[in-house]
Amino acid sequence: MTAENRPPVGDKQDKGQAVQEMFASIAPRYDLLNRVLSLGVDRGWRRAAAAEALAHSPRRVLDVATGTGDFAIELKERAPQVEIVGSDFVPQMLDLARQKAGAKQLSIRFEEGDALRLPYPDASFDAVTCAFGFRNFADYTQGLAEMWRVLTPGGRLVLLEFPPPASGLFGAVFRLYFQHVLPRIGALVSGNAGAYTYLPESVLAFPEPERLAQMMRATGFRTRYRALTFGIAGMWVGDKR
């Protein structure tokens, strides 16, 4: 996939297949790029989100858009007694997730599934998580509705995502890095310029934190937001009413 045919950004019905193809192409180097491009800070973000997801001692947790399984593995290492299921619609990512979990001798179910049509019954998970995948959904409202549907009453949703850069000096510096430095590094390491041009574009097109919180409330969640690392990342926590 080239920069010219990278996925559309924002909440768009026609981007699902393009996103699927893009992540399939970068799967082998996805983890390395995450570490390099975030300077390793993404691990701390995942730890904070895992603590929220496990706060009420869930029995079953679904990690949506699990990718190569980093967050599902974080959850299982923190709570070995909890059943963890990782779902993604990119088979190449799931293959890597299974290899990583197997190397750590962790029992995690990784299953192929579309986040907009989750293949699970109503009220079947006590917590649902999504780390840096929600931004890639073709329909944010439908994605939230599906995650609400599979949660048990009182269950918790935790979203970890990149909000648009804030205003001010730090936001300007981060925007410069995100738009001009990150795509070059990503293209060099992955060989896919389109994927790492799409990333900053998708962040800039993503809803502001309060707007996403409002969408969650409209779906039926009691919602709160926490900025991480000066707002580079954000965590939305929603409890199903």
Curated annotation (Swiss-Prot):
Recorded superkingdom = Bacteria
Positions with a binding annotation for S-adenosyl-L-methionine: T68, D88, D114, A115
Q: What is its EC number?
A: 2.1.1.163
Q: In which pathway does it act?
A: Quinol/quinone metabolism; menaquinone biosynthesis; menaquinol from 1,4-dihydroxy-2-naphthoate: step 2/2
Reply yes or no: does the keyword ATP-binding apply: no
GO terms classed as biological process: menaquinone biosynthetic process; methylation
Reactions listed under catalytic activity: a 2-demethylmenaquinol + S-adenosyl-L-methionine = a menaquinol + S-adenosyl-L-homocysteine + H(+)
- Which positions form S-S bridges? none
> What is the enzyme's main class?
transferase
Q: Does the keyword S-adenosyl-L-methionine apply?
A: yes
- What keywords sit in the KW lines? Menaquinone biosynthesis, Methyltransferase, S-adenosyl-L-methionine, Transferase
Q: Do you know which PANTHER family this protein is assigned to?
A: 2-METHOXY-6-POLYPRENYL-1,4-BENZOQUINOL METHYLASE, MITOCHONDRIAL, METHYLTRANSFERASE
Protein name (database record): Demethylmenaquinone methyltransferase
Q: Give the organism, scientific name.
A: Deinococcus radiodurans (strain ATCC 13939 / DSM 20539 / JCM 16871 / CCUG 27074 / LMG 4051 / NBRC 15346 / NCIMB 9279 / VKM B-1422 / R1)
Q: What is the lineage of its organism?
A: Bacteria, Thermotogati, Deinococcota, Deinococci, Deinococcales
